[in-house]
């Protein structure tokens, strides 16, 4: 019987060491060597203090900043420990009521014309750090007015921070809200 169990135990130990120790250490080493910023969360610091991550959205308030898309992560939104979408069906009355309220709030804040879809819809994770260029441009007037800046200067800033499709064909053009707001803080 021991002759039958020995190969099984040997394989268990070998694969445990291979997949539980060697592989994770190798991948961590490769990540830290080739992509140290991304492997550590793409954290952004200002004055030695971490102000956010380029990979995780955060709630931004205040008229002088660009706002991210709505979040369904946690009760108050943007809870990284509770990342999720709303899981509401497209026919859900609760979803319809929330979107209607969001559209009304945007209209009250001065939005005119078409409203970008991501201005009123949540992402799958609830923590998307990006918004569409259309949603960013919709906010230019409000942000410029709050900061006493020319709209053209803020529009130029947005245009310069639009990220294209990955590898030229995957995804949609987008703007990282944290990058945009930090760049906005440098304008005079």
Swiss-Prot record:
Transmembrane regions: 11-31
GO cellular component term of the entry, any: plasma membrane
NCBIfam families found in the cross-reference section: kdpC, PRK00315.1
Record-given protein name: Potassium-transporting ATPase KdpC subunit
Predominant location: membrane
Recorded superkingdom: Bacteria
Organism whose genome encodes this protein: Azorhizobium caulinodans (strain ATCC 43989 / DSM 5975 / JCM 20966 / LMG 6465 / NBRC 14845 / NCIMB 13405 / ORS 571)
Pfam families assigned: KdpC
Subunit structure: The system is composed of three essential subunits: KdpA, KdpB and KdpC.
GO molecular function: ATP binding; P-type potassium transmembrane transporter activity
Record's keyword terms, sorted: ATP-binding, Cell inner membrane, Cell membrane, Ion transport, Membrane, Nucleotide-binding, Potassium, Potassium transport, Transmembrane, Transmembrane helix, Transport
Family affiliation: Belongs to the KdpC family.
